[in-house]
Every structure is written in structure tokens, then in C-alpha cells.
Amino acid sequence: MSNAITMGIFWHLIGAASAACFYAPFKKVKKWSWETMWSVGGIVSWIILPWAISALLLPNFWAYYSSFSLSTLLPVFLFGAMWGIGNINYGLTMRYLGMSMGIGIAIGITLIVGTLMTPIINGNFDVLINTEGGRMTLLGVLVALIGVGIVTRAGQLKERKMGIKAEEFNLKKGLVLAVMCGIFSAGMSFAMNAAKPMHEAAAALGVDPLYVALPSYVVIMGGGAIINLGFCFIRLAKVKDLSLKADFSLAKPLIFHNVLLSALGGLMWYLQFFFYAWGHARIPAQYDYISWMLHMSFYVLCGGIVGLVLKEWNNAGRRPVTVLSLGCVVIIVAANIVGMGMAN
């Protein structure tokens, strides 16, 4: 396995670790509605940071974006909006299926759809079937899916042992939402694929290869921001128990505390895709679809590890922790199989 591929896998791991931890600051926000908290974090992660970093990277910010036709920008934006819909469905999936089953089904579907649909769309799926390296990467995807399933099972055992249940368990509604979440969340993978002309244009302007994907985030995350912020603002305006004015009428120290923590959560959310871009840049072009598989499987891996570190599994008993550990090992094996396939 080459150093470039190893570093690509490493940066995807770092990005996934940030994704697994980003909600921790949000949990410490006090006396704010989820909608206000999510909006503040989202403005930081989907608008301020993508625009600020792109302005630093590009020699002429406006000239860069105006150089693309609507036919180039629109698919990137719409796939970003597609991801935004998946993001909202994610929370609803947890409500109706519970954390473990919801995450397992949604992540499993988005891992498959986001990874395999890209080469199908590009018309080069035959390369995966007809080459040794392609077949090995497909095997890695399958092993990763098995690892996600094992971690999901560990979560179910933990919830059963600790008496944790879904907020409003509804299998039929939850499965529909989980499938929708999985499909729509893959929009981020499709957006990165559609944004290749933007990456190439950034490279032509002298942007470092590690950073060429970052300017496209202005458009991708702009699409996601409209969906997420629109959802939050509509609820803040229509739901009687929610009030943006009330949330910002608290004592100033508490408002500062909440804004700071929400912004930190937004920063950590953005960093997952900052390092995703670094990892993506190190993956061989013919295997760039594997970035999504690495990100999602490492997200599950890091989520399990973070749960252990935060002692969320302390009262779960030995068996769930053993199953979780097995799932994490399987995901690590999957990453190595994929790495060897890309190096073949």
C-alpha cells in the first residue's frame, strides 16, 4: 500500500472522528430549542467556514464561481440539498427506530448507495468487476457493511440491557424514513462527484491538491443549508412552544455560552468534510468513490470508540462491548482490504 493511499485512509479516519464527536458541544447547550442550536451551528459549518476558507484559498473568489455555467453548479447544489433532506430524516429515523437500528439501517444504505452509485453513474462499474483491484475494493465494501451490521447489533444489545427504547417506536414509518435517509444522505457523495470540474478549476488556479475540493463546499453545503435552516426557521415560526426571540432573551452569559458551544459543534461538523477533502485527494482517481465508504464506515467505528471513552457502555455488560469490539475490528479489516485493492 503506497504512502499516499495510507494517508488518504488516515485523513478519512480523522474526518470521521470529528463527525463522531461533533454533537458533544451541542449536548452542553442550555435552555435553547434544538432548532435554534442547530441553526447557529449550521450557519457556522455550512456558510461561514466554507465561504471563509474558499476566500483564503482562491486568488479571486467571485471570478472562480462566475466561471462555471449553471449546468455545472446546479447538480452540485441540488445534490447538496439532497444531502440536507437526508440530514433531517436522520433525526426522525432515530425517533421511530431507536439509535442502533436507525443508525445501522441508514448508514448501511447510504454506504452502499453513495459508494456504488457513483461508478455506475460514471459508466465505469465494469472496472470494479473486471479488475483484481476493483473486486478487492468491492470485497472491502461488503466487509465494511458487515462491520456496520455487527456494531448495530452491539447497540441493540446495549439498548436492551439498559432498557433504552425508541421515543415513538414505529417499525413501518421508521423503515421508510431510514431508507429515505440512507438514499438522500448519499447526496454528499454524488455532489463531490458532480463537483469534479470545480476541483479541476481550483487546481488550475494553483490551489494545493489537498484543498481543491474545499471551494466546492460553498455550493454543496449551500444546498444543504437551505434545507436544514429552512426546516428550523419554519418550525421556529410555526410551533407554539418554540421561539427564537425567547432563546435570545436569556441572560447574556448564557447566550454567549450557547453560541460558543453551538459554533464549536459547527466547526467540528465542518472539519469532518475538511479532512474528507484531504483524504479524497489522496485516493487514486479511479477509486475516488471509495472515499464515501471509508468515511461512513469510519464514522461508525469512531462512534463506537467515542461511546466507550465516554463510558456510555459501562452498564451494558460484557457481551455488547465484545460484539462492539468485533464490529470495530471488522471495519478496520475492511479499510485495509480497500487499501490493498486501491494499491493493486
Swiss-Prot record:
Please give the NCBIfam families that the UniProt record associates with this protein. Answer: PRK13499.1-1 (NF010021), PRK13499.1-3 (NF010023), RhaT (TIGR00776)
Q: Where in the cell is it found?
A: Cell inner membrane
Q: What is its main location?
A: membrane
The UniProt entry lists membrane topology as: Multi-pass membrane protein
Q: Which residues cross the membrane?
A: 4-24, 38-58, 68-88, 101-121, 137-157, 175-195, 214-234, 259-279, 290-310, 323-343
Q: Which InterPro entries match?
A: L-rhamnose-proton_sym_RhaT
* Biological function: Uptake of L-rhamnose across the cytoplasmic membrane with the concomitant transport of protons into the cell (symport system).
Pfam families to which the protein is assigned, alphabetical: RhaT (PF06379)
What's a Gene Ontology MF term here? symporter activity
Family listed: Belongs to the L-rhamnose transporter (TC 2.A.7.6) family.
Give the protein's recorded name.
L-rhamnose-proton symporter
Q: Which species expresses this protein natively?
A: Escherichia coli O17:K52:H18 (strain UMN026 / ExPEC)
Q: Give Gene Ontology CC terms.
A: plasma membrane
Q: Which gene encodes it?
A: rhaT
Origin: domain of life? Bacteria
Does this entry carry the keyword Transmembrane? yes
